[in-house]
């Protein structure tokens, strides 16, 4: 994957726009998506190691960034996973650099689930906005634009 990929339009109609960008997931192709509707934007990272700023560009100013949180900070997860997934400290840095309004941590394996306080503290070291852990059927209400 190129260090800086273009943002591509996937869908556009009168009410909604979906864009995507290639993200770093070792040698496995992966993309992140931005969904815009009604004056709001939600970005879903997909699996990524975040070794470049592609997600920062796609997520710029988003209301919500849903971020793959499949590893703990090193050495808390298997070494091979760090070429595929973003450590919590870097997640906080990406969210702050993109100036997102809130962050939802998703794709939570047991190692992350059992270390929520540690993971949250690490994310908050770089990002001061609201942070939530995702759960099935979660609903996020957004204020009127």
Predicted regions span which residues?
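Cap/insert and terminal regions of metallo-dependent hydrolase folds
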Residues: 41, 49-138
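Core dinuclear metal-dependent hydrolase active-site scaffold
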Residues: 1-57, 136-145
